[in-house]
Structures are given as C-alpha cells and as structure tokens.
C-alpha cells in the first residue's frame, strides 16, 4: 500500500468514526442495535417472486424484512448483499433526507436492516421499498474500490473476511467446500461407516511419511506431535471391532508452502474390514461421482483447459507402466522391469536423465516414485488409479502376493495431482515390525520424513487386525478440482502465511 493510499484510507476511517460518534449522540445508544429481525433472504425472494410482474407485486403488497451489507449506491437504490445473494432497497427522497440527518448518510460496507413492500423495477429487478430501516453496524473501514474483488492475492488470504465480502468466486468456492464435506459424510454414513474422532496430539507421530510439528505438554512434561495422519489410531479401532470407520479432520505436516501444499490441511480417512484395495477403488469411483453430482449437478466439469469426467470407470495402471507410457522415447525406461528397479545405480542414472535431483538416502522405490512424479504425474488429468507402489515407500501397506517388491497400494490422481492414497493394510505384525525398523534406519540415514517405531501399534496388530483396506482423500485438493481453482490457498479459509515484515 502506497503512502498516499494509506493517508486517503486513514482520512476515510476518521470520517466514518465521526459518523459513528454522531449516531451515538443522536440516538443516545451505542450505535450497534440488536433488535432488528430479518424474515427473508434475497435468494428465497428471487426464487419465489422473481417471475411475477411489476403489477402483480404491487397488488400483492408483500412486506418483507431484509438485512445485509450495502455494496453499492445507485441514485435512490442501495444494493444489499447477504449470504444468499443480493437485492436492492429503494430510498424515496424523504427517506434519503432522514438517512442523512440521522446517520450522516450511509457508506459502502455499512450493514442495515430494511422493512417494506416488495416491488419490481422497470428493468425487472426486485427491490424493497424502505418503509422502515435501521443502521445495524457502521463499517469503519472502506472496502476495496474495485467492487469485483481484491487484486492483491496475498491480501485476499490475509484478510479473507474482505475477500469474502467483495469476491463472489471466493464465496462460491467455500460454499462448495462445505457441501462437498457434507456429501462425503452422508455417503460414508449411508455405506455403513461410523464417524469417529482420534487424537490430534501424538506421543509418536505415524501414519504417513512426513516431518511433524512438535509441541510440549507441560503437565506431562513430554514432547508431543501434531498428527500427520490418523491412520494408526483408526486401525486400532478396527482391531477393537469397529469394522467401518471414518474421520474428517485436520492433519499437520511441517513442510513447505506451495500451490498444492499447506502445512495444515483436511483429510477424510476411512478403513473397512474384509476388503482390499480393489474394493477401495470401486468405492472411490462411486463416491466421487455421487459427490460431484450432488454438489454441482453433474459428474463432468471444467478444470483449466480440460473437462474432467468423474463418471464411469477410472483408468488403472501400475506406476511402472505409467512411467513407460509418458516416456515413450526413453530407451532405458522402456526396457525397465522390477528387477531393474532394484538396481540402484541404474535408477539413479535414469532419475538424473529426467532431471530429478537425487538424494543420497533414497531407496530404489523412492527413485521410481520421483521419476513418476517428474515425468508422469503432471499429465494425469483424468481420474486415474496408479497401482503397484514399491514396499520400501509403503511401510504400512500389504505386500503383493505375486511380487513382494510391490504392495497392494494405489494413489488416485486427477488434474495432474494426487488426491487420494489407499491400500490393503499390512496386518502381519512381524512384517510391520521389520518395516518400522527399516524406517528407523532410514531416519538415522538422513530421511527426516521416515516413520517412527510405534510399539503399541505392533501390540495392537498382535491382537489381530482382520483383512482391511484403508484410504485417505485430500479434501482441499478435491475442492480445488470441483471449483476449478489452481492453488490450495483459494480453498482454505485461512491458509498459512509468512509473518508480515
């Protein structure tokens, strides 16, 4: 903000504070009344009366009470915005004079209540005749001059309340988000899943490969970790006999900010006994088609230059096949087999040839995943399940019966990004013990995202986890797709931001 703009804004704020002082003195009150009751919403009025003629409304003489924020002043008309939409209020000359005398006039951003008969203008717009009115809240700060929204992206995120006032697209995105969460919850309950809540603070972080946030519990005098995933607790519940469970909640990962990543994000994670990863893929197809149709009225929608189709069966291919498909001219990749993937020198050579910056502690499976992420993932625009993830990057997934180098795991991609991760669960306590130990070794070798050893979880497995499949779906990324937005900050109400200087 330039110095001149700041001076102009300070002047406007001072003027509005002066008006509020005038109101308090004139009304002998605090200037923030709370006795006006609204009985109608703009959207409902438009739906019920929008098709009626001007003459029909005059004959009907339907009196309504509306309330909202003044977004524009056009001659005798005020444009009032509330949660369902916008509607005009008409101030006759005598009312305009009263507003000036009582309130020193209304400003853009003020919140008012209006009561009067519903009419229609010559242009066909509904409006309420201001027969009774009250200033409910005086806006002391001016809204951005451009009515269509903020132009400063960072300010939109730091002052989301202003963004929501002036930006229709932003409001729409968060309305869609709320509906998506509700639709997923209803779908899961209808499928016989029980919603549960598991701890947000863990003594041992687990359930995903990520760097955790650390906090300290003063009463217990122990360090604790904000959860990176609820997985191990949810599977403990399956051991306990709750055969279908789900949770919609926050996860926290102490990692970087990007258009795809926010350190605090929302996941829907669920587990179902007596199922495998194929059942999960089938359920995901049904869920996403149902959610899209329920929220947006169609299972087909635009995303950038593409039309994404959530209906029907989704593509399924192994990670190795996907790499080959999107690198048709790379001879070493075309000749690659799982035996070749086990050759670390070969994998390092291939990774470097496709511009992957290789870390010294990466396993062969990690190298394969990085090659996939660099060359194939961005091209997966339509719904696609990528399967056959190596066991060394899937420490909680069940090994494949025919090839123990890979697991019965998939990740779900759409719009060029991962949206979900699921697998048949590892329920062999001895195998899980060995994989936890391998993760500890990886952490000691420099992999900050490797998992910790969780002895109690091993104890739970020793009591017996039935054959189980589980999956996590990123709510934020799913909402990005359904709202055709390309940065995660546009679908998180208050995203993480660097402190202002």
Swiss-Prot record:
Cell compartments where the protein resides: Cytoplasm
Which cellular component appears as one GO term in the record?
cytosol
List keywords of the entry alphabetically: Aminoacyl-tRNA synthetase, ATP-binding, Cytoplasm, Ligase, Magnesium, Metal-binding, Nucleotide-binding, Protein biosynthesis
Q: Which GO terms describe its molecular function?
A: ATP binding; lysine-tRNA ligase activity; magnesium ion binding; tRNA binding
The Gene Ontology biological process terms listed for this entry are: lysyl-tRNA aminoacylation
Q: Which InterPro entries does this chain map to?
A: Aa-tRNA-synt_II, aa-tRNA-synth_II, aa-tRNA-synth_II/BPL/LPL, Lys-tRNA-ligase_II, Lys-tRNA-ligase_II_N, Lys-tRNA-synth_II_C, NA-bd_OB-fold, NA-bd_OB_tRNA
For this chain's record, the cofactor binding note is: Binds 3 Mg(2+) ions per subunit.
Checking NCBIfam families in the record gives: lysS_bact, PRK00484.1
Family named by the database record: Belongs to the class-II aminoacyl-tRNA synthetase family.
- Sorted alphabetically, which HAMAP family does this protein's record hold? Lys_tRNA_synth_class2 (MF_00252)
Its name, as the record gives it, is: Lysine--tRNA ligase
Source species:
Aliivibrio fischeri (strain ATCC 700601 / ES114)
Gene, per the UniProt record: lysS
């Amino acid at each position: 903000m330039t110095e001149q703009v700041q001076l102009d804004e300070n002047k406007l704020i001072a003027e509005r504070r002066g008006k509020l002082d005038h109101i308090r003195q004139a009304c002998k009150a605090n200037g923030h009344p709370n006795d006006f009751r609204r009985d109608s919403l703009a959207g409902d009025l438009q739906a019920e009366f929008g098709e009626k003629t001007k003459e029909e409304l005059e004959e009907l003489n339907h009196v309504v009470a509306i309330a909202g924020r003044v977004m524009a002043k056009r001659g005798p008309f005020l444009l009032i915005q509330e949660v369902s939409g916008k509607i005009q209020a008409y101030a006759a000359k005598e009312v305009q004079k009263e507003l000036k005398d009582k309130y020193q006039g209304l400003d853009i951003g003020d919140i008012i209540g209006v009561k009067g008969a519903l009419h229609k203008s010559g242009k066909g717009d509904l409006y309420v005749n201001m027969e009774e009115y009250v200033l409910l809240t005086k806006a002391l700060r001016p809204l951005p001059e451009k009515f269509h929204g903020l132009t400063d992206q960072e300010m939109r995120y730091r002052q989301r309340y202003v963004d929501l006032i002036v930006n229709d697209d932003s409001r729409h995105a968060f309305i869609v988000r709320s509906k998506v969460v509700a639709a997923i919850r209803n779908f899961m309950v209808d499928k016989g899943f029980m919603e549960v809540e598991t701890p947000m603070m863990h003594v041992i972080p687990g359930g995903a490969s990520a760097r955790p946030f650390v906090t300290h519990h003063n009463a217990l005098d122990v360090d604790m970790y904000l959860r990176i995933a609820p997985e191990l607790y949810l599977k403990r519940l399956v051991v306990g006999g709750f055969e279908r469970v789900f949770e919609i909640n926050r996860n926290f990962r102490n990692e970087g900010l990007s258009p795809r990543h926010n350190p605090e994000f929302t996941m829907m994670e669920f587990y179902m006994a007596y199922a495998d990863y194929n059942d999960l893929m089938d359920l995901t197809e049904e869920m996403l088609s149902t959610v899209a149709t329920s929220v947006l009225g169609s299972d087909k929608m635009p995303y950038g230059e593409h039309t994404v189709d959530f209906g029907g069966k989704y593509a399924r291919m192994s990670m190795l096949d996907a790499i080959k498909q999107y690198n048709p001219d790379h001879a070493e990749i075309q000749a690659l087999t799982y035996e070749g993937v086990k050759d670390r020198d070969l994998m390092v050579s291939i990774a470097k040839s496709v511009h992957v910056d290789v870390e010294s502690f990466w396993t062969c499976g990690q190298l394969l995943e990085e090659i996939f992420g660099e060359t194939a993932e961005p091209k997966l625009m339509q719904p696609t399940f990528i399967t056959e993830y190596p066991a060394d990057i899937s420490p909680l997934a069940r090994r494949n019966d025919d090839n123990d180098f890979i697991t019965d795991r998939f990740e779900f991609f759409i719009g060029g990004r991962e949206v979900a991760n699921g697998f048949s669960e590892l329920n062999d306590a001895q195998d899980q013990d060995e994989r936890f130990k391998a993760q500890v070794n990886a952490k000691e070798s420099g992999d900050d995202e490797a998992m910790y050893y969780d002895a109690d979880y091993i104890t739970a497995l020793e009591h017996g986890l039935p054959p189980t499949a589980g999956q996590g779906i990123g709510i934020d990324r799913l909402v990005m797709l359904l709202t055709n937005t390309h940065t995660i900050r546009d679908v998180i109400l208050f995203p993480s931001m660097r402190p202002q200087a």
